[in-house]
Swiss-Prot record:
InterPro entries per UniProt: PEP-util_enz_mobile_dom, PEP-utilizing_PTS_enzyme, PEP_util_AS, PEP_util_C, PEP_util_CS, Phosphohistidine_dom_sf, PTS_EI, PTS_EI-like
Binding site residues for phosphoenolpyruvate: R296, R332, N454, D455, R465
Main localization (coarse): cytoplasm
The species this protein was found in: Buchnera aphidicola subsp. Schizaphis graminum (strain Sg)
Required co-factors: Mg(2+)
UniProt protein name: Phosphoenolpyruvate-protein phosphotransferase
GO molecular function: kinase activity; metal ion binding; phosphoenolpyruvate-protein phosphotransferase activity
Entry text on domains: The N-terminal domain contains the HPr binding site, the central domain the pyrophosphate/phosphate carrier histidine, and the C-terminal domain the pyruvate binding site.
NCBIfam families attached to this UniProt entry: PRK11177.1 (NF008382), PTS_I_fam (TIGR01417)
Note: The reaction takes place in three steps, mediated by a phosphocarrier histidine residue located on the surface of the central domain. The two first partial reactions are catalyzed at an active site located on the N-terminal domain, and the third partial reaction is catalyzed at an active site located on the C-terminal domain. For catalytic turnover, the central domain swivels from the concave surface of the N-terminal domain to that of the C-terminal domain.
Lineage: Bacteria, Pseudomonadati, Pseudomonadota, Gammaproteobacteria, Enterobacterales
């Protein structure tokens, strides 16, 4: 039995089709001065062909997944046509006298590797998109045929080293019952599209392509993270029963999507979605998100060769605000640094990047970046209910400085006769012990708090969650972290304000009742977690969850907390 990473839940039974992709090997070959123009033309012709293909895929994607998913390939086309990318490739061809193919591979691979260094899974997985674009461009430069999944005419479970977003967009559910890959993660566009298709998928198995051969019969059970090769009749029958139970459970959860998260004794909780771009809105709305609890704007800055302009940002924020139809959209300003690098910004190499020049610290030092982003957010606020969220705040002075900047920009926009929400709400991320400890001072300066449990846990426990030697110590259910969360929530309520949570803990089913009992006002999570969290809240008594919270807050160890959570009966 083989396992991997859940990309999209479900069960599939079928024969294997191995999708083999040969790596394109480009041997170093210097070109003559006379051939430079020829190679540059090869690049332009390859790009033109790639844009045409991606435009066709974009249209087909819109028809299959809905208009919102077209944005994935609009992004691909934008990167292909990016002036900085073009300039870098042409400069390499001209100055180093290398072929268009070699120059393209060098530049694209550099961008992909920069993204892979990022610990944030969502941004890290954008490397797959960059390589997808680069591979297409490279093949078109070299006149190599591109894989077309539309040619599959038998029912199969597709197995490959990886699947790119453009390949996933070609999946025909009539013939492709599910897919498994060696590479990939849960937040890649491939996984996101698989969830939109509701097709069973497991990624990140490392070596599934070496464990199976064509026509092997397999069971792909992504519910239990199991891949069973050539199973017995008994196992097939057992898994068929699991499939039936899952189908009925899924249908019941669908009914909850558009219901409110109201406890059995009438306490209402707001449930939101964390997103990275416009394509995620479709899944958020489909799963019943009442708001966007976190819009990670970093994605706008990644996978490109220059900072996004104010207008580019404005269009992105405006589209999301309009798509949410006046439901709250909390836009976090750029959270770059730490493990999120932007090659074109030449960020310094630091010994402790997570304790260094990152997030709001960069924005405050680079006022042109801050101003462009805040102006874009303010302008977009005329088209929906937008809130501003500042990350990595550790002092009252920072907030006051930022509020002055917002006010200055509001005056600017008025002079330019541009419309915006003059009463726009401003909040801060609580993701350091410093901000949690002085929450009583910070809350007087803002409208709301949003707890980022990923960084709060890391900083509170002094544990680098990306360090395999100590990652076992990273535990958001640690008594110290739970105490800080409770303190922050209570302080916000004392001042008549509210606290949300956008870290991974918000979507963790084990602690839903605990967070509810601690008084958390808003849970924001991955869209696919929303129906299940709503189900738990709707079955829970608020008063009983408060009793649970009181007991948990007295616990001295994580084990004691988990024991209390496991014993709690809804």
């Amino acid at each position: 039995m083989i396992s991997g990473i859940l990309a999209s839940p479900g069960i599939a039974f079928g024969n294997v089709l191995l999708l083999k992709k040969e790596e394109i090997v480009i041997n170093r070959q210097n070109i003559s001065t006379e051939n430079i123009k020829t190679e540059i033309n090869k690049f332009f012709n390859g790009r033109k062909k790639s844009v045409k293909q991606l435009t066709e895929i974009k249209i087909a994607t819109g028809e299959k997944f809905g208009k919102k998913k077209e944005g994935i390939f609009e992004g691909h086309i934008m990167l292909l046509e990016d002036e900085e990318l073009e300039k870098e490739i042409i400069n390499l061809i001209t100055e180093k006298k290398i072929s268009a193919a070699e120059a393209t591979k060098f530049i694209i691979e550099g961008q992909a590797k920069a993204l892979e260094k990022i610990k944030d899974e969502y941004l890290k997985n954008r490397a797959i998109d960059v390589r997808d674009i680069g591979s297409r461009l490279l093949k078109n430069i070299l006149n190599i045929s591109i894989v077309d999944l539309n040619n599959i005419k038998n029912q199969v479970i597709l197995i490959s080293k990886d699947l790119t977003p453009s390949e996933t967009a070609q999946i025909n559910l009539k013939y492709i019952l599910g897919f498994i890959t060696d590479l990939g993660g849960p937040t890649s566009h491939t996984s996101i599209m698989a969830r939109s298709l509701e097709i069973p998928a497991i990624v990140g198995t490392v070596n599934i392509t070496k464990k199976v051969k064509n026509n092997d019969f397999i069971i792909l059970d992504s519910l239990n993270n199991e891949i069973i090769i050539n199973p017995s009749d008994q196992i097939i029958n057992e898994k068929k029963q699991v499939e039936r139970k899952y189908f009925f459970k899924k249908e019941n959860l669908k009914k909850l999507r558009n219901l409110y998260a109201t406890t059995t004794d009438g306490h209402n909780i707001k449930i939101g979605s964390n997103i990275g771009n416009i394509q995620d809105i479709y899944s958020a709305k489909k799963n019943g998100a009442e708001c966007i609890g976190l819009y990670r704007t970093e994605f706008l800055f990644m996978g490109r060769n220059a900072l996004p302009t104010e207008n580019e940002q404005f269009q992105a924020y405006k589209e999301i605000a309009e798509s949410m139809e006046n439901k709250p959209v909390i836009i976090r300003t750029m959270d770059i640094g730490g493990d999120k690098d932007l090659p074109y910004m030449n960020l310094p190499k630091e010994e402790n990047p997570f304790l260094g020049w990152r997030a709001i610290r960069i924005s405050m030092d680079r006022k042109e970046i801050l101003h462009a982003q805040l102006r874009a957010i303010l302008r977009a606020s005329a088209f929906g209910k937008i809130y501003i969220l500042f990350p990595m705040i550790i002092s009252v002075e920072e907030i006051r400085t930022l509020k002055i900047e917002v006010h200055k920009l509001q005056i600017q926009l008025k002079k330019e006769h541009l419309v915006f929400d003059e009463n726009i709400k401003i909040g801060i991320m609580i993701e350091t012990p410093a901000s949690a400890i002085i929450a009583d001072h910070l809350i007087k300066e803002v409208d709301f708090f949003s707890i980022g449990t990923n960084d709060l846990t890391q900083y509170t426990l002094a544990v680098d969650r990306g360090n395999d030697l100590i990652s076992h110590l990273y535990n958001p259910i640690s008594p110290s972290v739970i105490q800080l969360i409770k303190q922050v929530i209570d302080i916000s309520h004392l001042h008549g304000k509210w606290t949300g949570m956008c870290g991974e803990l918000a979507g963790d089913e084990r602690v839903t009742t605990l967070l509810l009992g601690m008084g958390l006002d808003e849970f924001s999570m991955s869209s696919t977690s929303i129906p299940k969290i709503k189900e738990i809240i709707r079955k829970t008594s608020f008063s009983k969850s408060q009793e649970l919270a009181k007991k948990v807050l007295k616990a001295a160890t994580t084990k004691e907390i988990l024991d209390l959570l496991n014993k709690f009966i809804i």
